[in-house]
Structures are given as C-alpha cells and as structure tokens.
Amino acid sequence: MRMTVRRYRRRRTGSDSLGSTHSPFALPFFDRLEYLSQSINQTRKTDAPFIILVTQDNYFRSGFLSGQSPLSNCCDYSTLDAALSDLNHWPSSRLVVDIESRASPLIDLLDQLRRHSLFAPYLTPYLLVRADDYDARLFCKAAGPFHVLERQLTALGMQQTLLEAPAPAGNRKEWFSRDEWPILQALSQGRSLRQIAQLQNRPYSRIIYRLSCILAKLGLNHRHELLHLLNNLSDFTY
C-alpha cells in the first residue's frame, strides 16, 4: 500500500504537459554537458552545428556562413520542416528562424513552432524580427516561449545572446492559450466570430471572452485593431 501511495504522489506531482515530466524549458542533462563543452573553445568547430538557421535570404545567410566561429558553424535551411527534422540529431544547437524572409504567413510558421515548443521536444527557438516591425515582434512574444531578437544585431551581439541562452521572457499566462490560438487562426482566415463559435461548437459569449483575453495580451483595445494586425502578418516576401 505504501508503494502504491508513493507512485500515486509521483504521478500527481509530475508535469501535466505531454511528453516529458521534466521542466519543459530546461535542457536535458546531457544536452547541457554538450552545450558547456562547445562553449569552452568556440574557435574550434564541433560536429554539432552551433546554429540551425532557417532563412530564404541568401545575403543574410552568407553573413552567417562567412563570419567568424561560432556563428559560422551553421547549417542553413530554406524551410522550417527540414530544419526541425535535422534538429533531432543536434538537440543542443540553437534554432534561429528569420521571420523577415518567411515563405508563408507568420501565424502558420508560429503554429508549427508552438507545437514543438509548448510540447515535447520543448524547443525555445530564436526569432529574428526587424527592429521596426512592431506588430511581428508583439505577436511573436505573445505566441509562445520564443526568444525574439532584432534582425539588425551585430555579429558580436548575436553571438553573446545565443551563448547566454536566457530563459524566455514572460510566462504561460502571457502567451496565447490553446483555446485562444485557434480563434486567431480562424480570424486570420477571414472567419467571423459567429462562424468560429459554430465551428468550435461553443457559445458565442465564450468566443467573445477569449477574444478579450487575446486583446489584453496584445495590448489592443478593439478587435478591428487585431484584424489589422493579423492582416499585416499575413503578408510574406518570398
């Protein structure tokens, strides 16, 4: 009986997130060892790349590859799917996603990152956003546990930031919840709030409540401001 109670308590105190019972934003023990070993001598390239870069901007990509180590120790990809596939082999590498040169709407890209960040393998990617793109920076910070960096950072500033690997700003209460995110996706597709209520089989009042939570997290006052923001984020350059 004592053993049964102990096991039950262990289950109760474990994480209620899918996948792992460890802290979702802490690197596993062996990944931390690899991270420390790579930081001892960054002038010597390692088998695992320091950066996994996702961008379609050839000029931006060449800036990393032709730079100094450790930034030049980089594997570059044009799509997020390919990068996530190879990241399984190098869990200690930093995933850096260039938001500016995306080939799809930002909300679609963030949806994919959310599924890999809020659940196993609990990634904490770095998102590069233009300094003057206030809408994208605001939305990315509220979308999940992401490091949002200015795209115009110097090489030294970028290196220091990636080496420090700080905890993501904010907490779960400041990110869009699993009930709010589908509403944002539907709004970005041009659906009305009543249509969303019908699709989700929920009372209209609940959709209005979730909308008010979304507006509060983005610091907006009216849903027209939200629709304008979503319209801006739907544009892509490649």
Regions found by a protein language model. Give the residues of each.
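N-terminal regulatory/sensing modules of transcriptional regulators
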Residues: 1-166
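Short glycine/serine/threonine/alanine-rich loop segments
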Residues: 10, 202, 220
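Residue-level recognition of oxygen-bearing side chains
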Residues: 82, 192, 225
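Long amphipathic alpha-helical scaffold regions
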Residues: 92, 179, 220-221
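Residues within the DNA-recognition helix of helix-turn-helix
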Residues: 161, 210-213
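Helix-turn-helix DNA-binding segment
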Residues: 169-209, 231
